[in-house]
Amino acid sequence: FFSFKLNSQPNANVTIAVNSSDTTEGTVSPSSLVFTSSNWSTTQSVIITGVDDSLDDGNQSYTVLLGAASSSDSNYNSLDPTDISVTNIDDDTAGFTVSSISGVTTEYGGTATFTIKLNSQPTADVLIAVSSSDTSEGTISPSTLTFTSTNWSTTQTVTATGVNDSAVDGNQSYTVLLGAASSSDSN
């Protein structure tokens, strides 16, 4: 927050509008300050609140815009206080969260599943290829996960299904492979 007061007593009310240059990064309250001949020397506070936008967009600068004073007192009318520069510190990091696998694949159709979701909202679609290191032992569905700016925080399920290969080969290991994320979002 910041505080504001007048330097001298006005002979009429003085109103100063308060706005944010980018309400997607920060908001202000109240939207105006009103000084009278009785409260002119009392500081009034403006609360600045950063917006948590879920985007890994780095620290973002914006401005608290203080409008020109409006008053019938000619000493104050149209005086324009200095705007205030503010930075919204970003707390979002691009990446994804993968759950532990649940279940065991078998040659009789046994399945194992895990989920994956993004850690921050992308600015463009994010595609992740999913495959098996040995398709003769296990298949993977789906083969591609698509995360958008609207479904990024919703978990998507990947299912591994064992393949009956009719060979007496005991337990066989294979790996579910997650490809590198593909997106025009630079994060």
Where does each model-flagged region fall?
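Short boundary segments that mark the start of a structured unit
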Residues: 1-187
